[in-house]
């Protein structure tokens, strides 16, 4: 959520920066009118309350002097009714303003490239060389099916499309990856491990920005108004909702493993086969709470921590700086890390690393004090995938496949695979 005071005082600047996102600014236009009405109502209400206070004093004086106070009492009642009417109008306007503020996306940082869509994203760096196979690379779903380590067909029978059974060495590979990632981030990158709930309430989804705008993308438990987590970012960020931290508490670094659930409402016909776009998938998530002045340095460090996973797995990748039109609702700046997928001869997203500045903290009420009695300030929050595990499995199956259909186990994973070097 943006700072309402900043929006009011810098309306044209905010409007211009949001135009770079390609956003519909209808809600922003409504803000100006409603905010003006709100301030007028507050002024009128304060004036009437002062009038009521004077009437109260007058009534007391009249009663002390044994004079007729009925006209003054009647006047005070009428003023009270006017105040009640204005208070109701004010409440209605403030509710509308809150919904508008919740629907306005974050402001892009000045370093974010201006552009319309993914075609305007800028490559920041590239690592590793794509494998040069002497045979035609198979897509990962064929590699996995031939090895009988992933079952897409039976998952479709049991649940439906975009679900999967891992089995045998496929399940072992998935488990090896999340243990490897959790160990790396906890032991080498200094994160505290978390295993969060997979179900969250509406306030949590609102705090991180999934609601109200993207409710159709979420899996909802209708009877309880609960939601399946789309990412561990939601429960872990809300771990400190409505809290005031001390300066010594920052930075806070949490790494969480969880299943993630997405409806993929806007993805009909895209990636209908394989592990790239599933309704349920496992992910390791990195969440940071930092002082505002540190957040952009932390974004670079966070992105490097996610990259380290791919480097140790020896998977070629590139880092893309997202343009304003492909930034997402909550991020002020975002990097996507994309891994090489040989069968598609392209890079595909495997991690997003974002700085939200105080956008989530303002929605979730997460603040800190620099001094014991100091004025609370909003923290800056950041998160990144470290990594999406299903997509990492896909990348390993494709980049490490051999002509005979077997798959080499990346060296760094072998201790997690009982020393196994080959799948097949």
From Swiss-Prot:
Its EC number is 6.1.1.11. PROSITE patterns: AA_TRNA_LIGASE_II. CDD domains: SerRS_core. ATP binds at residues 262-264, 349-352. GO terms for biological process: selenocysteine biosynthetic process; seryl-tRNA aminoacylation. It comes from the Bacteria. Pathway: Aminoacyl-tRNA biosynthesis; selenocysteinyl-tRNA(Sec) biosynthesis; L-seryl-tRNA(Sec) from L-serine and tRNA(Sec): step 1/1. The keyword Nucleotide-binding applies. InterPro entries: aa-tRNA-synt_IIb, aa-tRNA-synth_II, aa-tRNA-synth_II/BPL/LPL, Ser-tRNA-ligase_type_1, Ser-tRNA-synth_1_N, SerRS_1_N_sf, SerRS_core, tRNA-bd_arm. It is found in: Cytoplasm. L-serine binds at residues 231-233, 285, 385. GO terms for molecular function: ATP binding; catalytic activity, acting on a protein; serine-tRNA ligase activity; transferase activity. Belongs to the class-II aminoacyl-tRNA synthetase family. Type-1 seryl-tRNA synthetase subfamily. Consists of two distinct domains, a catalytic core and a N-terminal extension that is involved in tRNA binding. Catalyzes the attachment of serine to tRNA(Ser). Is also able to aminoacylate tRNA(Sec) with serine, to form the misacylated tRNA L-seryl-tRNA(Sec), which will be further converted into selenocysteinyl-tRNA(Sec). HAMAP family: Ser_tRNA_synth_type1. This is Serine--tRNA ligase. The gene is serS.
């Amino acid at each position: 959520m943006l700072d309402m005071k900043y929006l009011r005082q810098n309306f044209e600047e905010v409007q211009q920066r949001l135009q770079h996102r390609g956003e519909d600014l209808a809600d922003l236009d409504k803000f100006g009118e409603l905010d003006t009405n709100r301030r007028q109502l507050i002024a009128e209400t304060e004036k009437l309350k002062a009038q009521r206070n004077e009437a109260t004093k007058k009534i007391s004086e009249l009663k002390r002097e044994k004079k007729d106070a009925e006209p003054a009492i009647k006047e005070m009642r009428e003023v009270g009714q006017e105040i009640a009417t204005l208070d109701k109008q004010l409440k209605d306007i403030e509710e509308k303003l809150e919904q508008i503020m919740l629907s306005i996306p974050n402001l892009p940082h000045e370093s974010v490239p201006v552009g319309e869509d993914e075609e305007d994203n800028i490559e920041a760096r590239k690592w590793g060389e794509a494998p040069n196979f002497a045979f035609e690379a198979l897509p990962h779903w064929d590699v996995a099916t031939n090895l009988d380590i992933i079952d897409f067909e039976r998952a479709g029978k049991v649940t439906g499309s975009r679900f999967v059974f891992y089995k045998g060495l496929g399940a072992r590979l998935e488990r090896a990856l999340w243990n490897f990632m959790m160990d790396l981030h906890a032991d080498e990158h200094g994160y505290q491990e978390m295993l969060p709930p997979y179900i969250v309430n509406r306030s949590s989804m609102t705090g991180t920005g999934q609601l109200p705008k993207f409710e159709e993308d979420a899996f909802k438990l209708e009877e309880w108004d609960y939601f399946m987590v789309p990412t561990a970012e939601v429960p872990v960020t809300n771990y400190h909702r409505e809290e005031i931290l001390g300066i010594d508490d920052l930075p806070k670094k949490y790494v969480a493993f969880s299943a993630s659930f997405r409806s993929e409402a806007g993805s009909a016909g895209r990636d209908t086969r394989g592990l790239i776009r599933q309704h349920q998938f496992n992910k390791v998530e990195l969440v940071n709470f930092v002082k505002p002045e540190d957040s952009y340095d932390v974004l670079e460090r966070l992105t490097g921590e996610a990259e380290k996973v791919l480097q140790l797995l020896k998977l070629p990748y590139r880092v893309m700086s997202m343009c304003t039109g492909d930034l997402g609702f909550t991020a002020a700046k975002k990097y996507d890390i994309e891994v090489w997928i040989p069968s598609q001869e392209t890079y595909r997203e495997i991690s997003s690393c974002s700085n939200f500045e105080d956008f989530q903290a303002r929605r979730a009420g997460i603040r800190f004090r620099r001094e014991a009695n100091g004025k609370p300030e909003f923290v800056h929050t950041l998160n990144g995938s470290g990594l999406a595990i299903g997509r990492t499995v896909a990348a390993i199956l494709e980049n490490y496949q051999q002509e005979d259909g077997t798959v080499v186990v990346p060296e760094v994973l072998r201790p997690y695979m009982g020393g196994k070097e080959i799948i097949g």
